[in-house]
Amino acid sequence: MPLDTLRIATRKSPLAVWQAEHVAALVKARHPGVRVELVGMTTQGDRILDTPLAKVGGKGLFVKELETGLLEGRADIAVHSMKDVPMELPEGLCLPVILDREDPRDAFVSNTFKSLDELPRDARVGTSSLRRQCQLRHDHPHFQILDLRGNVNTRLAKLDAGEFDAIILAAAGLKRLGFEVRIASEITPEQSLPAIGQGAIGIECRENDPEVMALIGSLDDPDTHVRVAAERAMNARLNGGCQVPIAGYAELTDADTLRLRGLVGEPDGSLILRAELSGPRAEAEALGRAVADLLLHEGAGPILAELGLGPDADRS
């Protein structure tokens, strides 16, 4: 029996609501007779705003409560930023849809300077991401890298209040919320390799729910899905988390070939390891594991092990 109402679990931040409303609009455009309801939920990551994410630790800080809502039947799908989704999903849930990817790059935001290269030696740069902090410290050791938490609006307000000379945010979030004008410049992947899944929106649902699958299946973008699959396979092999700088970015160099770049670094930026491979898109996950193995061969294992992560760490 077809569903007449689709309940979407979402965080309550402006960006999360935008993403959920975007999915709702796509569903209604394809299935005009279906009602869509947003079910707002507060996650652990939303509650803890005074501590850097890397120190909070744990997996699924921004998704666990949404997944519980799915398993308890309070929602039919959950909409996530793919960079927040852990590698292992709870039993009974799946991730069948990844939408067409928005700009995956990091964005340089400043009211005074146009790019990283224009910043003075002791500039105050805000970002919550260890991945960004590591790459910034490696290339610009004289910057003051400061932690920055909160939603996009809060982070921009802190910049405008003079707490920072510049902040680094995901370009996708700024563009989705209508803040593209705040982007002074985009940061190339060569300068700052993006987070795994950055710019991509995923839809999670129950495995045994064919009615829901029928409603959302056509929203999947195969090119984005295969790119994110390669990135996530790399991260799964490394058994990484937000406590260590890990980056991964896959591109289609032609219709059938994937190029995947991966990075693991010391949090203080003193060491960055990089690896890159290309291969058939049909073998995206194998490509991800191969890039992870190259990083491990280069010495990523000890970096990960120091933080209780890596292939040999307990995954519980």
From Swiss-Prot:
GO BP term (any one): protoporphyrinogen IX biosynthetic process
Manner of cofactor binding, per the entry note: Binds 1 dipyrromethane group covalently.
GO cellular component: cytoplasm
PTM annotation (S-(dipyrrolylmethanemethyl)cysteine): residues: C242
MF terms (GO), sorted A to Z: hydroxymethylbilane synthase activity
Keywords: Porphyrin biosynthesis, Transferase
InterPro entries (alphabetical): HemC (IPR000860), Porphobilin_deaminase_cofac_BS (IPR022419), Porphobilin_deaminase_N (IPR022417), Porphobilinogen_deaminase_C (IPR022418), Porphobilinogen_deaminase_C_sf (IPR036803)
Listed cofactors: dipyrromethane
Record's catalysed reaction(s): 4 porphobilinogen + H2O = hydroxymethylbilane + 4 NH4(+)
Catalytic activity, EC: 2.5.1.61
Gene3D superfamilies tied to this protein: Periplasmic binding protein-like II (3.40.190.10), Porphobilinogen deaminase, C-terminal domain (3.30.160.40)
Pathway: Porphyrin-containing compound metabolism; protoporphyrin-IX biosynthesis; coproporphyrinogen-III from 5-aminolevulinate: step 2/4
Pfam (any one): Porphobil_deam
Function comment: Tetrapolymerization of the monopyrrole PBG into the hydroxymethylbilane pre-uroporphyrinogen in several discrete steps.
Similarity annotation: Belongs to the HMBS family.
Assembly and binders: Monomer.
Note: The porphobilinogen subunits are added to the dipyrromethane group.
Full protein name: Porphobilinogen deaminase
Source organism of the structure: Thioalkalivibrio sulfidiphilus (strain HL-EbGR7)
Gene from which the chain derives: hemC
